Design a protein with these regions (language model features):
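Small-residue-enriched flexible segments
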Residues: 34-72, 77-85, 91-450, 455-500
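N-terminal compositionally biased, intrinsically disordered segments and leader/signal-like regions
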Residues: 3-4, 21, 32, 124
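N-terminal mitochondrial targeting presequences
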Residues: 13-14, 29-35
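Short, intrinsically disordered, low-complexity terminal segments
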Residues: 8-10, 25, 30, 327
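N-terminal functional modules and adjacent low-complexity/disordered segments of proteins
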Residues: 1-3, 9, 29, 101, ...
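Basic polycationic patches enriched in arginine
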Residues: 21-27, 127
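N-terminal chloroplast transit peptides
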Residues: 2-20
């Protein structure tokens, strides 16, 4: 019975039912400017007009910059513009000029202007099979970084091997000695994403990393750097440095815990939970199901998720998953999908036939273990989680409150000027039934004054919870993870001159 229950929880992967689609009208351009930043958006179907419209205020912002100022220029286009991304990147690079480090990419929708979310208007199936259903939209986020800042860009095409993970000096030559933050963009077919994440975490431990995966466009390239379209499957890293530059990262995984905290007592391989508190995982899940509310039980059947954290982290505070009883202590769970069941070998016995010399092996297979999309170690803590719109809203609210507290306790005085928002393509209308939920919540938490831009990603890259600058945080929380159904916010600001 418990094995059947576990199979049901795995099989019913959580995919929110899309709301009824409504006819789309072209929206008025949305723009927002604050100090040295500009964000704009356009839904014009003509990519040339869309780039001009979204960049309407860029020239005014850049006119206030000195020749040696570093300029970060990001352009996001929905799948409706996928066939023109090379031309869009080139036109955008011309709009922002030679001083800027420009990136243009394809997402499942865009965030921009006054914090508006413009999704592509298609279901998940249509995104994969019929790009003509996607309503074109485009947004830009352009900023002049604080004095003394610099931007180093590196790109790794499938046939261009990045430095080995253990070669610190090679990575420092590429990205600088001590970047404040790195923006990481990659295509779903990227060959070097894992190595890039591992190297950034290993060699720049105080550097915040945020980014996302683009949405595939029939196998074609989806990212440009400085107006040039590189081969499909590339990974891009932008390293931002500067004494007055302040960059924070917040990641909300949109989940709620269900049941008690347990211990992983045995693993098989590196990604299989073989025992939880000395029992098969199916037995533990059955116990959680019996103690859950009707709503939690329904969500567990749709798709149970697993939250993991090192045992030592249970005594550390800071962001994580929303607790239904309002408890905000140490909820730093890395939430991962259950990707299958694996028979767990408990005992193995070998012997040989003296006459024939044949070697025999007998194995006793116990109950199936849980295969999860993360490395698991014996001693890790584990807790089952569920995901729905309520959990997603509550978790984002919790993470932003955590961010405000950690920012205040860090003691550094700085402004908040812009925010790069990267939600999953499975959020937005598909999850909440309306557009703009994540962006409105983030914008309000940042005081409503930040320039906002971003894109709907096919995988979100960031920490666990909120990481404020180089402030102390558990290593596993600072580590760069690829999330699902998450929203990542990268907050840009300028430190007070006295903080230099």
């Amino acid at each position: 019975m418990t094995s059947l229950l576990l199979l049901l929880c795995i099989a019913h992967a959580f995919v929110p039912s899309p709301p009824t689609r409504q006819p789309r009208r072209r929206r008025a351009p949305q723009t927002h400017a604050i100090r040295n930043w500009w964000s704009g958006a356009s839904s014009d179907r003509d990519w040339r007009a869309a780039v001009r419209e979204a960049c309407a205020g860029v020239a005014a912002v850049l006119s206030e910059a000195d020749d040696d100022d570093a300029v970060l220029a990001l352009c996001f286009a929905s799948l409706g513009h996928a066939q023109s991304i090379g031309s869009i990147g080139e036109a955008f690079d011309e709009e922002v000029g030679d001083r800027a480090t420009s990136v243009a990419l394809i997402g499942g929708g865009v965030v921009g202007g006054a914090g508006d979310e413009r999704e592509d208007g298609a279901t998940n199936e249509q995104r994969q099979t019929d790009n003509s259903e996607a309503a074109p939209s485009l947004s830009v986020l352009v900023g002049v970084l604080p004095k003394g800042s610099s931007i180093e860009a590196a790109s790794f095409a499938p046939d261009k091997t990045p430095p080995p993970k253990n070669k610190a000096e090679r990575w420092q030559e590429l990205l600088g000695a001590s970047p404040r933050a790195c923006l990481l963009f990659a295509e779903p077919s990227s060959r070097w994403l894992g190595r890039s994440c591992g190297a950034l975490d290993a060699h720049f431990p105080d550097c915040g990393v945020g980014g996302g995966l683009t949405c595939a466009a029939g196998g074609a390239s989806t990212i440009t750097l400085r107006g040039s379209l590189l081969p499909a499957g590339a990974t891009y890293v932008l390293a931002l440095s500067g004494p007055r530059l302040r960059v924070d990262c917040v990641a909300s995984q949109g989940c709620a815990p269900v049941g008690d905290v347990y211990e992983v007592t045995r693993t098989a391989r590196s990604q299989v939970v073989a025992e939880i508190d000395g029992r098969p995982p199916a037995v533990t899940l059955d116990k959680v199901m019996r103690g859950a509310t009707d709503r939690e039980r329904e969500l567990l059947k749709r798709g149970a998720l697993v939250g993991l954290r090192p045992a030592a982290a249970s005594r550390l505070s800071g962001g994580g998953a929303y607790s239904k009883d309002g408890d905000e202590e140490a909820a730093d769970w890395l939430v991962r999908q259950i990707i299958g069941q694996v028979p767990s070998v408990r005992e193995q016995m070998s012997w040989s036939n003296r006459m024939s010399g044949i070697q025999y092996t007998a194995r006793r297979v116990s109950d199936a273990g849980l295969a999860v999309d993360a490395e698991v170690r014996a001693g890790d803590e584990v807790r089952f989680h569920v995901r729905d719109a309520t959990a997603a809203n509550n978790d984002l609210d919790l993470q932003l409150r955590r961010y405000a507290l950690e920012r205040a306790y860090s003691g550094a005085a700085s402004s908040i000027e812009a925010c790069l928002v990267i939600p999953c393509v499975g959020r937005g209308q598909l999850l909440f039934g309306e557009s703009g939920s994540d962006t409105r919540t983030i914008g309000a938490a940042l005081g409503g004054q930040a320039a906002v831009g971003g894109f709907f990603a096919n995988g979100e890259l960031g920490p666990v919870g909120a990481v404020v600058g180089s402030a102390a945080a558990p290593v596993y929380r600072r580590r760069t993870h690829q999330h699902d159904y998450a929203v990542v916010a990268v907050v840009f600001g300028e430190a007070d001159p006295d903080e230099e």
